[in-house]
Amino acid sequence: MTRWPSPAKLNLFLYITGRRNDGYHNLQTLFQFLDYGDTVLITPRMDGELRLVTPVEGVAQEDNLIMRAARLLMARARETGRLPEGAGADLGVEKRLPMGGGLGGGSSNAATVLVALNHLWQTGFSEDELARLGVQLGADVPVFVRGRAAFAEGVGELLTPASPAEKWYLVAHPGVSIPTPVIFGDPELTRDTPVRSMETLLKCEFHNDCEHIARKRFREVDAALSWLLEYAPSRLTGTGACVFAEFNTESEARRVLEKAPEWLKGFVARGVNHSPLQQAIAGQTESW
């Protein structure tokens, strides 16, 4: 069995700049990885089978993102004559990231499967090819495939490499799961934030346009942010439900975590501009 890191991400800022004709929203956001996340487990098989060894309660196997990613890569490799005879895999995930938390867990899992199976099966797809497969699974998957902090536009698929400060974060989960459509479907969501350049946005104070909706509709999110803001600059990540506070040192973040009320679960992690997955592929590190 091989173990592969599947890191979390934070949206350091998130602005909604318009609604598209297809119902999706245009946005501008800044992705950064954390040195914390899930672990994807892969055991190569030689009988051509793909098996899920860690089912997720409430998620049908055909809807599971790691299985969808594996089937997508297998199909593309077969179409292009790159699939080794008998290539298959047992697939699983050790979950640490909450579902519906805004940390990108499912997208990260899918990207890790694409990148790791491409490596294990030696199918030879380029980063661009894997990213094009990934966007079929979700708008956030390409940033995890590419493994570099990025400024994203469009629906999140147009990526420009970025190098935000690698700060320490206390990431807290308020104990609720927020489906993305709940936030994007709210009539009070800000949808007309002016489009600005990456250079301009990096100089401004960071905000998340989804935050006021999450706080309005989920009192747990409001309470978590109110508590964190007593100690440090804090924001919602993605559409929630997770929130985060930023610190200059690990010790500062851990001191605040020790004071957290019982109802607020969290962890401390460092923001990193290069994904632990890419380091694992390069043989520079093992999974956490």
Curated annotation (Swiss-Prot):
Active site positions, chain numbering: K9, D140
Q: Which domain of life is it from?
A: Bacteria
Q: What is its EC number?
A: 2.7.1.148
Q: What class of enzyme is it?
A: transferase
Keyword field: ATP-binding, Isoprene biosynthesis, Kinase, Nucleotide-binding, Transferase
Which pathway does this polypeptide act in?
Answer: Isoprenoid biosynthesis; isopentenyl diphosphate biosynthesis via DXP pathway; isopentenyl diphosphate from 1-deoxy-D-xylulose 5-phosphate: step 3/6
Q: Which InterPro entries does the protein's record reference? A: GHMP_kinase_C_dom, GHMP_kinase_C_sf, GHMP_kinase_N_dom, IspE, Ribosomal_Su5_D2-typ_SF, Ribsml_uS5_D2-typ_fold_subgr
Keyword Nucleotide-binding on this protein? yes
* GO biological process terms held by the UniProt record: isopentenyl diphosphate biosynthetic process, methylerythritol 4-phosphate pathway; terpenoid biosynthetic process
What is the role of the protein in this entry?
Answer: Catalyzes the phosphorylation of the position 2 hydroxy group of 4-diphosphocytidyl-2C-methyl-D-erythritol.
Task: List, alphabetically, the HAMAP family matched.
Answer: IspE
- Which family does the UniProt entry place this protein in? Belongs to the GHMP kinase family. IspE subfamily.
Q: How does it assemble?
A: Homodimer.
Protein name (database record):
4-diphosphocytidyl-2-C-methyl-D-erythritol kinase
